């Protein structure tokens, strides 16, 4: 599968280039001037291989990919494409020849819709990073992970394919990479928002008040898996005013400036105290442990000796690992700060098995006629951890391969569906009692007036205005959004 990805991705980039990518401004390597760069949000890799174009209209688009999508979908070649919104796919159905060419769905009015394909059904339903029950079932500490992506990524598409005999590797379902930088925005939900204070001398402690990893480790996987093993998968980044100042001076304060600084949206998450004991009390962790942890850390800063986790405290550490260690400081000063962060998931790596044409395979390795899959609902390609950049190009490449094969291949006849394995079970999709019912009693009249709120949309902030008249919601207007218009326009208009 990786060989197929490598062989196809140049053509995929060329396809994007021919459809408008050539008109964009790219980040470039200062040393070479080439468009391929390193992506700093991922662990550094050996060869610059990432393209980072900027949207031509940043007021409407967060990423060039969405702008290109709007451009491509507006061309004559795609005029016949219909997108059905507010319609939920429920079941795949095979015909008497064993061909999976039927999808049963439910529309917004609760009516059953039957879709009949001529040659193929392509499943591009995503993974299960939005399903806490599934993550809990397959990952040891999955119940503690924050959902960092769309709640629509519930894994049900994978379950639908399982029900027509698709093979699912249970081990690969446990491949749920996390990021040790999740800010909890709502119960069980979060966004990537590291403090980066550890770059300039900050430390991270667990619920017991102890450090558990080398915060400056260039191997991000080591830090990710270490947090997964901590109580409640939570860490507290501990830092001081001097560390904040150095982080800003060294241009390492992107998250602090955007999220946590005074006046920023998550500033309320910053816990401040005049002593470590008071800080520990506010965090609900043992004060004696935190004080002992900081004392030990400061002693290593003074001596310059590496600590038990391998963190180094010399100028050579800065010179040799500047991307992760920009300054060395003690934890001391008039004020002490903490930011709680949890393990957060934005993608999963388990799913159904396919061949290089995207054809879904059964438990015996045979092709299920007519059924294709691409993107995050396919499992076992990348292994246990994220390979930087594949989250974007993977779906593009394998989507093109699947679509090409679907157009060129007649589904085989005479196939018999295999008995589904019970890797994924129906109870993983059971809805919990909606706690919102106790918060919003819609049977009671609402207060008349106009209300406005800004929330996190899929592609950026979304401002919504609501008008209440005679105790009822009279109008809802999306005043500002950054969504991909070719996909979201119809839903936004409603």
What is each PLM-predicted segment?
Residues 4-111, 132-133, 181-182, 294, ...:
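Conserved redox-cofactor binding core of oxidoreductases
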Residues 91, 289-381, 478-481:
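A glycine-rich dinucleotide-binding beta-alpha-beta segment and adjacent secondary-structure elements
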Residues 110-185, 389-392, 398-401, 405:
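Glycine-rich loop(s) and the adjacent beta-strand/alpha-helix scaffold that form part
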Residues 158-160, 167-285:
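An anion/pyrophosphate-binding glycine-rich loop and adjacent beta-alpha core
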Residues 176-181, 220-223, 343-349, 377-392, ...:
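Glycine-rich phosphate/pyrophosphate-binding beta-alpha loops
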Residues 232-335, 402-405, 409-439:
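Helix-rich C-terminal "cap"/substrate-channel and partner-interaction subdomain
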Residues 362, 366-410, 414:
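Catalytic phosphate/nucleotide-handling subdomain of diverse soluble enzymes
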Residues 442-494:
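Active-site- and interface-proximal helix/loop "cap" or "latch" segments in soluble metabolic
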């Amino acid at each position: 599968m990786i060989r197929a990805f490598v062989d196809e991705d140049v053509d995929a980039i060329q396809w994007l280039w021919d459809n408008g990518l050539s008109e964009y401004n790219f980040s470039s390597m200062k040393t070479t001037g080439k468009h391929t760069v390193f992506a700093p949000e991922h662990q550094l890799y050996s060869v610059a291989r990432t393209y980072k174009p900027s949207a031509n209209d940043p007021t409407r688009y967060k990423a060039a990919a969405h702008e290109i999508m709007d451009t491509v979908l507006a061309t004559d070649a795609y005029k016949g494409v219909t997108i059905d919104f507010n319609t939920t796919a429920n079941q795949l159905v095979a015909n008497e020849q064993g061909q999976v060419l039927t999808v049963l769905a439910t529309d917004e009015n609760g009516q059953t819709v039957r879709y009949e394909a001529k040659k193929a059904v392509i499943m591009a339903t995503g993974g299960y990073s939005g399903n806490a029950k599934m993550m809990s079932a397959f990952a040891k500490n999955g119940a503690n992970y924050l959902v960092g992506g769309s709640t629509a990524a519930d894994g049900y598409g994978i379950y639908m394919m399982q029900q027509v005999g698709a093979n699912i590797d249970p081990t690969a379902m446990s491949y749920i990479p996390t990021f040790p930088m999740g800010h909890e925005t709502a119960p069980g939900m979060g966004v990537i928002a590291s403090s980066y204070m550890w770059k300039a001398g900050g430390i991270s402690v667990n619920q017991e008040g102890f450090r558990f990893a080398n915060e400056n480790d260039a191997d991000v996987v080591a830090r990710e898996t270490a947090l997964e093993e901590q109580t409640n998968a939570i860490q507290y980044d501990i830092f001081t005013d001097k560390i904040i100042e150095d982080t800003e001076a060294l241009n390492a304060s992107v998250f602090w400036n955007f999220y946590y600084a005074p006046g920023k949206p998550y500033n309320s998450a910053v816990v401040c105290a005049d002593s470590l004991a008071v800080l520990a009390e506010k965090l609900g962790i043992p004060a004696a442990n935190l004080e002992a942890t900081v004392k030990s850390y400061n002693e290593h800063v003074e001596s310059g000796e590496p600590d038990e986790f391998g963190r180094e405290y010399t100028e050579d550490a800065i010179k040799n690992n500047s991307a992760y260690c920009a300054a060395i400081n003690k934890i001391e000063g008039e004020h002490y700060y903490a930011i709680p962060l949890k393990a957060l998931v934005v993608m999963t790596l388990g799913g159904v098995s396919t061949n290089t044409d995207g054809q879904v395979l059964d438990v015996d390795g045979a092709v299920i006629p007519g059924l294709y899959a691409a993107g995050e609902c396919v499992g076992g390609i990348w292994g246990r951890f994220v390979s930087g950049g594949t989250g974007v190009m993977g779906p593009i490449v394998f989507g093109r391969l699947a679509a090409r094969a679907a157009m060129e291949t007649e589904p085989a006849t005479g196939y018999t569906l295999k008995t589904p394995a019970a890797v994924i079970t129906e109870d993983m999709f059971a809805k919990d009692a909606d706690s919102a019912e106790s918060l919003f009693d819609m049977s009671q009249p609402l207060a008349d007036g106009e209300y406005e709120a800004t929330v996190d949309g899929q592609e950026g902030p979304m401002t919504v205005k609501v008008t209440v008249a005679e105790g009822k919601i009279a109008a809802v207007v999306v005043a500002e959004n950054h969504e991909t218009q070719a996909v979201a326009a119809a839903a936004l208009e409603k």
